[in-house]
């Protein structure tokens, strides 16, 4: 895939400082999941050059309605969808689109969970035009980082290559 939004197919390159910022975020929020966005120049679709932390609203939603939102930020992340939509629009307008949503897993692997898949794909369609990075933090230590991309026409995700430069 080349051209517009080719980053959704994966094989991305992330700057070392950007990855370090994401890893630091995951360690700072442990034992709770962190989340955020990664963007890069529209002119270089596979390049990831900036990270932006977002608030994990899982605890807020759990407190308001524990039946509908039974999980807390310990095992779940929730990004405000209205704020996310605005962030995607602003990033596109600035010619530095959001290419990745990242989050951490605490005391679990860097897999893309069934909950993650259900949140970000429905009826074979991707909710946001991006890929996903999952950071694993085990007992307060960084364990793994993986890039996940949507399999078009399905609700499945596959691992892809993430190069650090």
Can you say where each PLM-predicted feature lies in the sequence?
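Residue-level "edge-of-site" marker
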Residues: 104
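Conserved beta-strand-loop surface patch within small alpha/beta domains used
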Residues: 1-98, 107-165
């Amino acid at each position: 895939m080349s051209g517009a939004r080719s980053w959704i197919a994966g094989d991305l390159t992330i700057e070392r400082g950007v990855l370090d910022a994401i890893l630091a975020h995951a360690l700072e929020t442990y034992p709770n999941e962190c989340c955020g966005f990664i963007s890069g120049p529209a002119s270089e679709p596979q390049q990831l050059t900036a990270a932006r932390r977002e608030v994990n609203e899982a605890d807020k939603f759990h407190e308001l309605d524990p039946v509908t939102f039974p999980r807390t930020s310990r095992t779940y992340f929730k990004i405000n969808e209205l704020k996310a939509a605005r962030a995607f629009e602003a990033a596109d307008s600035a010619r530095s689109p959001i290419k990745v949503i990242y989050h951490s897993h605490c005391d679990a692997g860097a897999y893309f969970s069934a909950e993650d898949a259900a949140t970000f794909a429905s009826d074979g369609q991707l909710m946001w035009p991006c890929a996903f990075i999952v950071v694993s933090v085990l007992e307060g230590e960084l364990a793994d980082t993986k890039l996940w991309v949507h399999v078009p026409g399905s609700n499945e995700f596959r691992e892809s290559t993430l190069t650090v430069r």
